[in-house]
Design a protein with these regions (language model features):
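Active-site helix/loop of acyl-thioester processing domains in fatty-acid/polyketide metabolism
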Residues: 79-81, 90, 99-124
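Non-catalytic linker/capping segments at the edges of enzyme domains
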Residues: 12-97
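Core beta-strand residues in small-molecule sensory/regulatory alpha/beta domains
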Residues: 2-4, 162-165
Length: 175
């Protein structure tokens, strides 16, 4: 899609082979939330005196108290992964009663950056996202969202985020 003459988004269909690590439990992710950079004061270079890594972000920003997704990932397993206990909301439901795909894609956005941050690497904003939705997530169901570092090619860091349902089933993943 374009804004004026500037390309702002592009999509294509393709394969997405990715080894997705097993998630922690919802309770384990929830217990770690207090160490998430999403709650750190002055964690953002661009929003001084605010709380959070990206305070205004719809996905991870705590400034979106009423309308955000609250995917506040915290480091686990010796900083090898980050995870967030994500409480989806009933009022988000699409016609089938599921979390809309646009919210799943959004939930996959920030955990990759949080994974690099947990490893002591500060990255920029997301530049590219390839995702696959395997199973719908019923609106209102608790989920675990994870992120892990895949590697760096040149100056581009690559991460893998994933969404798991309350049974631990992989519902969506990205790179």
């Amino acid at each position: 899609s374009n804004v004026g003459e500037k390309l702002t988004a592009q999509a294509q269909i393709g394969e997405l082979p990715l080894d997705v690590p097993m998630p922690p439990s919802f309770d384990e992710a929830h217990a770690a939330r207090h160490i998430s950079p999403a709650y750190a004061r002055n964690a953002s270079r661009h929003c001084p005196d605010k709380i959070g890594f990206h305070p205004l972000c719809f996905c991870c920003g705590v400034e979106h108290e009423e309308d955000g997704l609250h995917v506040t990932a915290a480091p686990l397993r010796n900083n090898e992964i980050v995870a967030a206990a994500w409480k989806t909301q009933l009022h988000w439901a699409d016609e089938a009663g599921n979390v809309p795909a646009r919210f799943l894609w959004t939930a996959l956005d920030c955990p990759g950056q949080f994974a690099f941050y947990a490893g002591g690497i500060r990255t920029g904003m997301l530049g590219q996202l390839a995702a696959r939705i395997e199973h719908p997530v019923p609106a209102g169901d608790p989920c675990v969202v994870t992120g892990w570092r895949i590697g760096v090619q040149g100056q581009r860091p690559y991460a893998g985020p994933a969404v798991f349902d309350q049974r631990g089933r992989l519902c969506a993943y990205a790179k």
